[in-house]
UniProtKB/Swiss-Prot annotation:
Name of this chain's protein: Ribonuclease M5
Locations listed in the record: Cytoplasm
Result after altering D58A: Loss of activity, rRNA-binding normal
Name of encoding gene: rnmV
Species the sequence originates in: Bacillus subtilis (strain 168)
Family affiliation: Belongs to the ribonuclease M5 family.
Record keywords: Cytoplasm, Endonuclease, Hydrolase, Magnesium, Metal-binding, Nuclease, Ribosome biogenesis, RNA-binding, rRNA processing, rRNA-binding
Keyword Cell membrane in record: no
Residues the entry annotates as binding Mg(2+) 1: E10, D56
Phenotype when changing G31A: Loss of activity
Required co-factors: Mg(2+); Mn(2+); Ca(2+)
Cofactor comment text: Divalent metal cations; Mg(2+) > Mn(2+) > Ca(2+).
Subunit composition and interactions: Requires ribosomal protein L18 (rplR) for catalysis; it can be replaced by 30% dimethylsulfoxide suggesting L18 functions as an rRNA folding chaperone.
Catalytic activity: Endonucleolytic cleavage of RNA, removing 21 and 42 nucleotides, respectively, from the 5'- and 3'-termini of a 5S-rRNA precursor
Amino acid sequence: MKIKEIIVVEGRDDTARIKLAVDADTIETNGSAIDDHVIDQIRLAQKTRGVIILTDPDFPGEKIRKTISEAVPGCKHAFLPKHLAKPKNKRGIGVEHASVESIRACLENVHEEMEAQPSDISAEDLIHAGLIGGPAAKCRRERLGDLLKIGYTNGKQLQKRLQMFQIKKSDFMSALDTVMREEQNE
């Protein structure tokens, strides 16, 4: 599988794993304190070939994603679910631990960042669905993010991410229905 865009990852182990999965070029941020010259590289890549951000599904990875998104508008985003980024017998989480199939799958389901449009998914919808506040909210948001391929967000950021990736209410409701059915079957 050949990827036209340049994939932004956190480090060289991530690059090695990406190259096992797909034919692609990468830019490494080397941590969450991203140097200006790396941002400049990403800007140039965005202008010439496009950029896909694929960071670890953890707090530092989300911080890197946000930093790049703010500095370089219009990037595409690929999200790797947490459970697919865990090593088999060690601690930690990251792209470098994901299977080749998982990496390919998340790169086939990229979302393009767009100007946030008013959404027909309201904050009340999120509260009513038990995605904000309540004992199961975090688990529900995590599973919803996996199903919609938008990654995990906290309650405050969920509506913004749904708007940014222009998730349709019908897709949201379908994914939410799946989350609720899975919850009942546990």
